[in-house]
Amino acid sequence: MILLKRTKIRGVSVSFVSLQRRTHSRLVNPIRQQHQQITKQRSSKILKNAHFYDFRSLPKVPTTQYLEARELTRDILYSGYRPVMYPVKENPLFRDKKRKSLQTLLTMNEKTNAEAKTIDEKKHKNILFGERGTGGIMSGGVNGTWKYNPTVPNELLPFNWWSTSSMGMEYFPEWKNVPPYMMRKLKPFDKALQMRLTHKSKKKMK
């Protein structure tokens, strides 16, 4: 609706055109209110995030966006995680009792104690390194590295798929004599594939 009002101000007649668009005013006012509310909410959220979620002190790490599932599963399988059983740490509550017992044994018979000590050392070595010095399920891991750092030795990488067990607890020294270029070409054993090859060879023979 357009209404024309004619008024006289100080003897001067001025025509004022007042545009009254009711539909427009009804729509504009709530939109402005909504916009103001949204801006207030956003500003409050920004302040909250800046106050509570400040990640600037955290170190930067490479992105995990382009990781492949196969590589992840392979790394998890060969990463060498296992339940830690050996070596068992000495309980400080029983140190004095052990020292007293050792002193009494030394006074009674030094020779027998020395022999027992050498046997204990051998057992300790077997526990850490295994009987052959190559680790094992009852040992501390690959060549005893589980005692200090739970990783496969560098000399066995990247061919540890063949030269070590799946959990990296035992390595097989006979694989050291195999050249790396031959190990690269190796593939896991597939019984079905071998059966197909034998079947084809039999057909050719016929």
From Swiss-Prot:
Q: Which InterPro entries match?
A: Pet20-like
Where would you find this protein in the cell? Mitochondrion envelope
* UniProt key word Nucleotide-binding: no
Q: Name one Pfam family in it.
A: Pet20
Domain of life assignment:
Eukaryota
Transit peptide feature range: 1-24
A GO BP term here is: protein catabolic process
Q: Which GO terms describe its cellular component?
A: mitochondrial envelope
- Keyword entries, A-Z: Mitochondrion, Transit peptide
Presence of the UniProt keyword Hydrolase in the record: no
The role this protein plays is: Required for degradation of unstable forms of cytochrome c.
Protein name from the UniProt record: Protein SUE1, mitochondrial
Q: Which organism is it from?
A: Saccharomyces cerevisiae (strain ATCC 204508 / S288c) (Baker's yeast)
